[in-house]
Amino acid sequence: MLFRSQDRANAEQQAMINRLADEFSNELNNLGVRVARLEDRVGNVKVTGDARLRYKDAEHAKSKFDARARVQFNAKVNDRTDAVVRLTSGNFELGDSRTEGKADAQIDRAYVNHKFGERVSLKAGRFNQVIGGGLAFDGTFDGAQLNVGNDKIMAQAAYGYMVSGDAAGLTKEENVTDLIVNVNGKVGKHAMVGGFYDRINQDDDVRNVYGFNADANFDKIWIGGEWLKASSLEESQAWTAGVGYGNYDIKKQGTWGVKGQYFNAKENAPIIDTTYNHIYTTDAKGWMATVDYALQNNVGLTANYGFDWKDQNGNDKADFYRADLNYKF
């Protein structure tokens, strides 16, 4: 009898639920649509940023202490499209109250990225572009970028204008367009190799630049390097090689890493906006040591020391020093 009573009660409850659902179906549907729309919009915009305090000095030179702050907005347009905008203060010297020493907020990233499935994406606007391993260029680029690939091999084509480094401050008429092709592939479990070609649409001798790069990581050991050249232009080779040890991750307190690199760039090397922190980018050769340490989660200290630098004729160049205190949020 008890089981029959429970069955009857359950049946009556279900019947009541069905009647209420039928009676208020429109209201429930409207509420459901509104809730779904709200859920779709929750978390659509992600805000991140970073701040940096930097100290620079060199032998027989005046030291400089400057700062920079950046805020980035990543907006989810739909499940395949993202829009990104980043504001930056630029580098401003602390203690300099003149107009040129003040922070000047501007947009240095503004682009849309659309995914065509899992292996193809297209980016357009103002974004960061890297050529090869970054020895020649790792900076701001206005144009379009196509990416195709998977976990083992990646091909990238970009067309547009370099607008940072030596290309900063140029008008559109003064600037030139670049067609960049990068190809990178994984070799085994630990190594990546890549090559690039950069076609520069201008009339002088620097029109075709190519290069190769490689990186290998074995647990905490890193070995890597890059070589590049402008074809049909003498004294245009540049290369770097280095070795490092550690597991530095700015997100994890207490992690650290050390690195030593050698750089050699001829007088006409096509270095526009390098990814590295050495101050002599052409007609120079020398060493740079780097130490990274995560003081706290998302707080990192980086120190660089450049030593034994000379020009290509063997004349000494000044040692240089740099320390960055970086904050991520």
Where do the model's predicted regions map?
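Outer-membrane beta-barrel pore domains
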Residues: 8-15, 19, 35, 54-64, ...
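Short, Lys/Arg-enriched charge-dense amphipathic segments
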Residues: 32-39, 110, 147-152, 282, ...
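Outer membrane beta-barrel
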Residues: 44-46, 50-56, 62-168, 173-194, ...
